[in-house]
Amino acid sequence: MSRFLCYVSLAFLLLGVSSCEKEEVQKVEQKRSYPGDVQVLNSCGIKGAASSMRNYLRSQGFDVVVISNDRLQNYEETILVIHTPGWEGEEALAKALKTKNVLHVQNKRAYVEASVYIGKKLKKIIQQDDL
């Protein structure tokens, strides 16, 4: 009987060790009291870029409320424009976009906290090959 318990204990121990090895690293999301509304504009000319960026930003915890095409379609790099000074999501959004191109354009009539102008280096940001 004690041999049986020993085998059962060993089995549980091995199962516990193997399940620990298979655990994936969870991404740590920065929680904000207000996610902020974000506008995404396709400024690179790549078909479906705004939809892909919307999906990526939503997976990162941002509330994308508007997507559309920009009049200009020749941006090489992604640009982040902040409309609300002091918005707590600014740093997290810039980090998610992997950009240092951040402009502050205060607009009291803006209905979003930030606008994202997608550049041609979109794939480097969202790490997808399906574009």
Question: Where are the regions a protein language model picked out?
Answer:
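Bacterial N-terminal signal peptides that target proteins for export
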Residues: 1-8
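BRCT (BRCA1 C-terminal) domain core and associated BRCT-interaction motifs
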Residues: 64-118, 123
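Extracytoplasmic/periplasm-facing segments of secreted or lipoprotein envelope proteins
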Residues: 30-74
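C-terminal motif of bacterial Sec signal peptides marking the signal peptidase cleavage site
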Residues: 16-19
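Short, solvent-exposed mixed-charge patches
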Residues: 129-131
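Accessory recognition modules or surfaces
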Residues: 25-36, 77, 84-87
